[in-house]
């Protein structure tokens, strides 16, 4: 495992984050979680909307049975559309903590934004929860750069704690259309520049473009893989895919691991969210952390230069 540091989080944070959203029951989930921890993983991503709180309850049961809460970094998310209000963020957090059988989460994200709500109202609620010790560092998931900056401007003007973490999409493939309604990518140059200059940590979801860098991403399979085609099929992405395949062959690894390495090689703190369904998938993801890229390889993969 490899780790990163986030100001305000006491523990080093595993850069491969285990998503708690693809497991149906504890019998399926516990072996995945156990193996992840045994391989050095310590960061788990939860959200109130996953299975309408069912995934939180499952993970809360796991925490109660294993006693590992103090050894991990716990991410919570709440206030997903259509309940994206400051009041919902507060009430859903209490529901989440009860389900997770803990008194705080280490990292908290508003799962969506609501542009109809003045950004300061979100900051006020999160700052209060932070001061009460219910949440550690906090930020937004699927937030625009304009609103993210506005949140921090408000926090600075009013002596409040600001947003220090972000969870938007970032992948080697450009997200052509949102995977789900309200999804936002951090891939545009202005977002990337802000992340580097501000020191904001990014927790990237769909960091390998949801299968685009496997055989499922081949353009000939557009009809049967319509979800991949909808969000990722574009000529520039096909060229990125071809380059990932070529570099994977040269390095003796897989295109998926090359795509993951691209996300983790950014010049700012990145953490990749992973939602494996099987032990084999989880282990491949962790093994892929050993793949490294030079700056020139990273830029070549992203079509910024002609040679790696």
Labelled PLM ranges:
Residues 1-72, 131:
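N-terminal binding-site loop/beta-alpha segment at the start of enzyme catalytic domains
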Residues 17-27, 77-87, 111, 116:
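Active-site mouth loops of central-metabolism enzymes
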